[in-house]
Amino acid sequence: MAMGLMCGRRELLRLLQSGRRVHSVAGPSQWLGKPLTTRLLFPAAPCCCRPHYLFLAASGPRSLSTSAISFAEVQVQAPPVVAATPSPTAVPEVASGETADVVQTAAEQSFAELGLGSYTPVGLIQNLLEFMHVDLGLPWWGAIAACTVFARCLIFPLIVTGQREAARIHNHLPEIQKFSSRIREAKLAGDHIEYYKASSEMALYQKKHGIKLYKPLILPVTQAPIFISFFIALREMANLPVPSLQTGGLWWFQDLTVSDPIYILPLAVTATMWAVLELGAETGVQSSDLQWMRNVIRMMPLITLPITMHFPTAVFMYWLSSNLFSLVQVSCLRIPAVRTVLKIPQRVVHDLDKLPPREGFLESFKKGWKNAEMTRQLREREQRMRNQLELAARGPLRQTFTHNPLLQPGKDNPPNIPSSSSKPKSKYPWHDTLG
């Protein structure tokens, strides 16, 4: 027996040194009632007839001991469970400029947060600009130009109507100018009968040929609210300012919230506006048709330049886009095929002898000033006559002659009628008149 124990002890030490271990962990049924136990099975010495096995139990998480005792404690530790790391998702490659735009768009505040945009005409324009910039991805200068073209396309039917009426007026211009000359001369002469007669004949002539002089002015009257709404919308965005508007420009005008530093845009807008008005792109009436309109047109761009040169660049971007669109539009409407499709009458070339002679700018200005002065004097004279008639209707009759109309010159006075010379002169002679 002692020999078997000695052999078993030597075998235990040999197994512990060589690291040969046999683990038998208690099953789950034993976890509820007993703590986790590690069981070791060691073969006995081979000197015996049959092998003996030593069953060692180690209770508790303690390390095995190599002391002279017959029990070894083994610590059992489960390996930590490491979750599988997911593979990183593929990130699309973006250029540096596009990355900056994406980051700026993501960080940009909406117009509602900035206090812009509403259901007014100005707010609707701001909402349209925001849609084109944020949703469509256009830069601010492109969004302003695209919004301008969209607005001008909406009023294109009015442009065609104005062109039709302008062509009709031009074809009947000699007769219209004759009636206008008769009316003006009758008014200056104070001949009311001739004035109303010429006015009536001119109205009948216009009705017969379907001429309406106010129709060419419908387009400027309609476009004025659109221009004012765009101006206010862009001015509010620049004065706030919208952060992205400060870097949404082009070329030398990167900041759309300030005025043009080298004044190229104001000069370009002035030149294009003069061309638009001179060619009649907005009204359809060329400046050579009406003398007074030509003179006013030539002065307007120069008058507005000192006032508009300090506007924000965003306003000039809209203005320049609108003027360029008008020039392209009038160029297309001069094509005969386009005029035929749109049913615009062809312009008749009149004989210069049938038209009144053209005057220079100074002569026309002096003549207009003289006509205005004469019109004012006639108006004052009519007002004085009206006041005298009203006074005569309310008060007593007043003497309007220097002698007695009852006395005939060259004849003696009747005997029963006393001479007027025998009577003392009254201080108020009109009191003695018949009434």
UniProtKB/Swiss-Prot annotation:
Record-linked InterPro entries: YidC/ALB3/OXA1/COX18 (IPR001708), YidC/Oxa/ALB_C (IPR028055)
Q: What's its membrane topology?
A: Multi-pass membrane protein
| One of the Pfam families matching this protein, by short name | 60KD_IMP
Q: Where does the UniProt entry say this protein principally localizes?
A: mitochondrion
Disordered, as annotated region? 400-435
Keyword terms of this UniProt record:
Membrane, Mitochondrion, Mitochondrion inner membrane, Phosphoprotein, Transit peptide, Transmembrane, Transmembrane helix
Q: Which GO terms describe its cellular component?
A: mitochondrial inner membrane; mitochondrial matrix; mitochondrial membrane; mitochondrion; protein-containing complex
Relate the outcome reported for changing C147F.
Answer: Found in patient with a fatal childhood-onset mitochondrial encephalopathy, hypotonia and developmental delay; uncertain significance; cells show impaired assembly of the complexes I, IV and V
Q: Where in the cell is it found?
A: Mitochondrion inner membrane
Residues carrying Phosphothreonine = T400, T402
Residue ranges spanning the membrane: these are 114-134, 140-160, 213-233, 261-281, 300-320
What does the record give under GO molecular function? membrane insertase activity; mitochondrial ribosome binding; protein homodimerization activity
Stretches of the chain found on the membrane's Mitochondrial intermembrane side: 1-113, 161-212, 282-299
Keyword NAD appears in the UniProt entry: no
Q: Which residues carry this modification: Phosphoserine?
A: S364
Extract one GO BP annotation from the record.
aerobic respiration
- The reply on keyword Magnesium is no
Q: Which family does it belong to?
A: Belongs to the OXA1/ALB3/YidC family.
Instruction: Briefly state the protein's biological role.
Output: Mitochondrial membrane insertase that mediates the cotranslational insertion of integral membrane proteins into the mitochondrial inner membrane. Essential for the activity and assembly of cytochrome oxidase. Required for the correct biogenesis of ATP synthase and complex I in mitochondria.
- Subunit description: Monomer; predominantly monomeric at low salt concentrations. Homooligomer; predominantly homooligomeric at high salt concentrations. Associates with the mitochondrial ribosome. Associates preferentially as a dimer with the large ribosomal subunit 39S of the mitochondrial ribosome. Interacts with OXA1L; promoting cotranslational quality control in mitochondria.
Q: What is this protein called?
A: Mitochondrial inner membrane protein OXA1L
Please state the gene responsible for encoding this protein.
OXA1L
